[in-house]
């Protein structure tokens, strides 16, 4: 994994997030809170363990994993998923599976910013973060 991912990132723009949350099955009240949140994402690495901590006024979440190894995750909207993160062509690609459903979150670096592309049932959401 590129060390360029490591550090603290602040959300600066979000496109189609409400539709993405709807596709995930997130209820209206949680979607409203999610749309208001401007999360900070902290990515760190210790040995071969990567940690992604997301902090917002709505909720804090943290996942720690080894690339290519499945782990259990409880998402910010309380889904219990089996997740796996891989590194492909410089992108951190996360797949979450639960109840026969699947979503992907692809994080890549573009012009010094971290771009997270989230996909579910044909809905694509793009969230852009700047390094703090």
From Swiss-Prot:
Q: How does it assemble?
A: Monomer.
Q: Name one Pfam family in it.
A: Lipocalin
Q: What is known of its domains?
A: Forms a beta-barrel structure that accommodates hydrophobic ligands in its interior.
Name one cellular component (GO) term: nucleus
Q: Where would you say this protein principally sits, based on its record?
A: cytoplasm
Q: What positions are modified (N-acetylserine)?
A: 2
**What is the disulfide pattern of this chain?**
118-125
**Protein name as catalogued:** Myelin P2 protein
Where, subcellularly, is it found? Cytoplasm
Instruction: Name the Gene Ontology molecular function terms of this record.
Output: cholesterol binding; fatty acid binding
Q: Which residues bind hexadecanoate?
A: 107, 127-129
Does the keyword Chaperone feature in the UniProt annotation? no
Which family, according to UniProt?
A: Belongs to the calycin superfamily. Fatty-acid binding protein (FABP) family.
**Domain of life of the organism in this record?**
Eukaryota
Which key words tag this protein in UniProt?
Acetylation, Charcot-Marie-Tooth disease, Cytoplasm, Disease variant, Disulfide bond, Lipid-binding, Neurodegeneration, Neuropathy, Transport
Q: Which disease is it linked to?
A: Charcot-Marie-Tooth disease, demyelinating, type 1G: An autosomal dominant demyelinating form of Charcot-Marie-Tooth disease, a disorder of the peripheral nervous system, characterized by progressive weakness and atrophy, initially of the peroneal muscles and later of the distal muscles of the arms. Charcot-Marie-Tooth disease is classified in two main groups on the basis of electrophysiologic properties and histopathology: primary peripheral demyelinating neuropathies (designated CMT1 when they are dominantly inherited) and primary peripheral axonal neuropathies (CMT2).
Q: According to its UniProt entry, what is the function of this protein?
A: May play a role in lipid transport protein in Schwann cells. May bind cholesterol.
Q: Does the keyword Disulfide bond apply?
A: yes
- Which amino acid positions bind (9Z)-octadecenoate, per UniProt? 107, 127-129
Q: Name one GO biological process term.
A: membrane organization
Q: What else is known?
A: P2 protein and myelin basic protein together constitute a major fraction of peripheral nervous system myelin protein.
